[in-house]
């Protein structure tokens, strides 16, 4: 019996108003899973209720979470980081979060713990019901169990004193030495050593009287003949390949090819890493996987930089538009105000209180305080002209 697939369908509040579109989305989800209604459990929720904590859902429960958002503008598809973390907890290991996802939050997605992968267009259209191009799918990675190394406790003895080394006692028979016999043995050994030195450095190693080389020289030549040049091997290999039609065995048949690395026998869940001097091609496969992952991350970072530059250009255009706007004053703003009339005040409203309360450009600077409505004469302008 196949295990059931748990799917969480997150809907934007604007989608809930159209019941026909919701049923159409559900039917497409069933079609993508071969219309096996009994093995699929779809839980339909509004995304606002989950973000506010009104509804609590079980963690590590859902195989897929599909988000439906009819808004096409990217600013209305933004998902907060708290909601990303909640979705990460709700998904099972290797679970997928797909649908109408934002395209400018890839850095937040990676920081949350997801892996961004591409999904084919046809499968994505069947599950989401949207006619868009190839999109990215957020995948919750499978946790890797780290091996636990148990350390053995060192045995401690209560005896702090160290035992002394034991020496074997010699017998009395071993202590007696036959002195003349030992002296004869020493002299014989010295004689043998001298004879070997003389034979090694004798004149036989040099050229003989006939002009022929000695036996040692001939042995050295034979050793040199045993060395094989790499180019000669290649020529010999080509020659044997040409003679294969005559039934002769080629030199390449004698070569030993290394055995290809196989998967581990413990369930086949994880393959072994390539050896240090790998020759079966497993190391190249691992390097290809790393390069593909690096290219994907570079594409994501490139799109992030592109979106940042576009946002900066928009901000500059907004500032230019604000700077081009000119402030226009009305006739009431430009009308003159008589500061001496009661009920009329200036910009600061404190001209009559004295210099301590007047502005820098006030014409009453230097004059004593006066009451509103009192006639004030300004003299001394002729001296400044």
UniProtKB/Swiss-Prot annotation:
Cofactor dependence: [2Fe-2S] cluster; [4Fe-4S] cluster
Protein name, per record: Fe-S cluster assembly protein DRE2
Similarity annotation: Belongs to the anamorsin family.
Subcellular location(s) per record: Cytoplasm; Mitochondrion intermembrane space
Region annotation (N-terminal SAM-like domain) ranges: 1-177
An MF annotation (GO) of this entry: 4 iron, 4 sulfur cluster binding
Gene Ontology process terms (BP): iron-sulfur cluster assembly
Function statement: Component of the cytosolic iron-sulfur (Fe-S) protein assembly (CIA) machinery required for the maturation of extramitochondrial Fe-S proteins. Part of an electron transfer chain functioning in an early step of cytosolic Fe-S biogenesis, facilitating the de novo assembly of a [4Fe-4S] cluster on the scaffold complex CFD1-NBP35. Electrons are transferred to DRE2 from NADPH via the FAD- and FMN-containing protein TAH18.
Compositional bias of kind Acidic residues: 217-226
Record remark: domains: The C-terminal domain binds 2 Fe-S clusters but is otherwise mostly in an intrinsically disordered conformation. The N-terminal domain has structural similarity with S-adenosyl-L-methionine-dependent methyltransferases, but does not bind S-adenosyl-L-methionine. It is required for correct assembly of the 2 Fe-S clusters.
Main location class: cytoplasm
Region feature (Fe-S binding site A): 261-280
């Amino acid at each position: 019996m196949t295990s059931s697939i748990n799917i969480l369908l997150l809907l934007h509040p604007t989608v809930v108003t159209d019941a026909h579109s919701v049923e159409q989305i559900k039917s497409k989800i069933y079609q993508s899973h071969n219309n096996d209604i009994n093995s699929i459990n779809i839980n339909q929720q509004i995304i606002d209720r989950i973000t506010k904590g009104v509804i609590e859902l079980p963690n590590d429960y859902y195989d897929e979470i599909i988000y439906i958002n009819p808004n096409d503008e990217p600013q209305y598809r933004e998902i907060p980081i708290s909601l990303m973390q909640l979705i990460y907890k709700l998904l099972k290991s290797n679970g997928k979060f797909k649908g109408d996802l934002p395209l400018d939050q890839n850095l937040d997605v990676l920081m949350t713990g997801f892996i961004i992968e591409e999904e084919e267009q046809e499968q994505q259209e069947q599950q989401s019901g949207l006619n868009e191009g190839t999109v990215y799918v957020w995948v919750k990675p499978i946790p890797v169990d780290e091996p636990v190394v148990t350390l053995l406790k060192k045995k401690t003895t209560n005896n702090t004193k160290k035992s002394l080394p034991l020496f074997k006692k010699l017998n009395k028979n071993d202590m007696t030495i036959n002195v003349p016999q030992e002296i004869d043995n020493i002299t014989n050994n010295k004689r043998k050593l001298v004879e070997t030195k003389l034979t090694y450095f004798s004149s036989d190693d040099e050229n003989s009287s006939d002009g022929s080389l000695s036996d040692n020289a001939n042995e050295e030549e034979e050793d040199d003949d045993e060395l094989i040049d790499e180019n000669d091997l290649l020529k010999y290999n080509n020659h044997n390949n040409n003679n294969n039609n005559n039934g002769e065995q080629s030199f390449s048949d004698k070569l030993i090819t290394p055995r290809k690395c196989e998967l581990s026998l413990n369930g086949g869940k994880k393959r072994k890493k390539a050896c240090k001097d790998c020759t079966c091609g497993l190391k190249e496969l691992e390097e290809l996987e790393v390069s593909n992952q690096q290219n994907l991350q570079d594409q994501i970072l490139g799109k992030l930089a592109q979106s940042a530059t576009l946002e900066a250009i928009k901000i500059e255009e907004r500032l230019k538009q604000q700077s081009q706007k000119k402030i226009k004053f009305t006739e009431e703003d430009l009308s003159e105000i008589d500061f001496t009339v009661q009920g009329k005040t200036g910009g600061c409203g404190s001209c009559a209180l004295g210099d301590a309360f007047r502005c820098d450009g006030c014409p009453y600077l230097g004059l004593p305080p006066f009451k509103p409505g009192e006639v004030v004469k300004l003299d001394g302008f002729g001296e400044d002209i």
